[in-house]
């Protein structure tokens, strides 16, 4: 997210700013938080790539009003499926709505009696995914350290002006680079048995 162009895009309909920590590299949260405060907007982070990343010595997931994490087998916190939304301040109305939407819009559940106040879906995470996630949490720091070492090597050895910066506090879910001849670059990397993807 380009922090220099956020304010010009804010309209009467804007309710929040949602930065994505792409590849695990943290967005400029201090600047974004100031813009949110000035314009009375919520800050909701997409931290799907950034489990274990730090920004200004604080873990990603502790800065925004709300933070979204989604899980996948190839992400830093490797799990079959699922996601989490965390709230960092008292947002009773939003919390109530999230709880209602997580399971078919059901609220006020009391044994066999309940209300369905709104449309919802089945967002419950299955126990299998949750169990794997708990085990993966214990390995997260070690795995992120390996990713950092690989990213450091890419940063020093890949000859391109337009590549992901190196930051000791980044979790490096992905390492992005832009090159003039993508096909040739991919071919060279695959010859060295380095998997390359085209993302977003």
Regions found by a protein language model. Give the residues of each.
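Active-site phosphate-binding strand-loop segment of PLP-dependent enzymes
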Residues: 1-79, 84-92
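PLP-dependent aminotransferase class I/II
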Residues: 2-4, 8, 16-20, 25, ...
């Amino acid at each position: 997210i380009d922090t220099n162009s956020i304010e010009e895009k804010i309209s009467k309909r804007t309710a929040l700013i949602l930065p994505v920590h792409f590849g695990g590299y943290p967005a400029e949260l201090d600047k974004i938080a100031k813009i949110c405060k000035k314009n009375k907007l919520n800050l909701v982070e997409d931290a799907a790539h950034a489990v274990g990343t730090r920004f200004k010595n604080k873990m990603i997931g502790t800065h925004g009003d709300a933070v979204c994490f989604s899980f996948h087998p190839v992400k830093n916190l490797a799990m079959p499926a699922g996601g989490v939304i965390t709230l960092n301040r008292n947002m009773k109305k939003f919390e109530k709505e999230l709880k209602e939407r997580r399971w078919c819009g059901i609220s006020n559940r009391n044994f066999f009696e309940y209300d369905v106040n709104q449309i919802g879906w089945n967002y419950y995470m299955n126990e299998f995914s949750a169990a794997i996630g708990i085990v993966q949490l214990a390995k997260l720091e070690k795995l992120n350290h390996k990713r950092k070492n690989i990213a450091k090597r890419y940063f020093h050895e890949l000859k391109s002006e337009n590549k992901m910066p190196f930051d000791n506090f980044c979790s490096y879910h992905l390492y992005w680079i832009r090159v003039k001849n993508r096909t040739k670059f991919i071919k060279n990397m695959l010859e060295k048995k380095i998997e390359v993807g085209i993302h977003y």
